[in-house]
Amino acid sequence: MSPKSPLHLTFLLFDGFSNMVLASAIEPLRAARDLSGRRLFSWQVSSLDGGAVTSSSRLAIAVDLPLERVGATDALILVSGYGMRAHLQRDSMLAVLRKARGLPVLGGLDTGAWLLAL
C-alpha cells in the first residue's frame, strides 16, 4: 500500500455473526475516512458462496461478492458468531486458507478468531 492508496479490507461473514461486531469494525473506518476527507479505507463484505448472510439478530445481509471472487485485498477478516462450529467444514476452511495465502493480514472478529485458531 502506498501512502496515497486506501487500505482495502474484506470482511467474510458467516451465518450467526453479530451486527454489533461488524458495525464496530466498519464504523471507525468510515468515520476516519469521512473526517479526514481522504479515502483512507475501503472495504467489501463477502460470504463463502456470495449469498446473503443471516446475523444473530436474524437480519439478512446482502454481500458484495463470494469469497472466490475477492481480488486484491490488504486484509481478510472473518466475522462469525455463536454457531461457529457449524462453519468448520473442510471445504469452507480450505477456501479461506487458499484466499488468505499471501495476504498481509488475516484476522478474526468475535468467534472468527476461534475459527482461525483451529
Placement of each model-derived feature along the sequence:
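Extended, subdomain-level signal for the structured scaffold at the beginning of enzyme domains
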Residues: M1-L106, L115-L118
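Aromatic-residue-lined binding/catalytic grooves and analogous aromatic/hydrophobic interfacial grooves
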Residues: D110
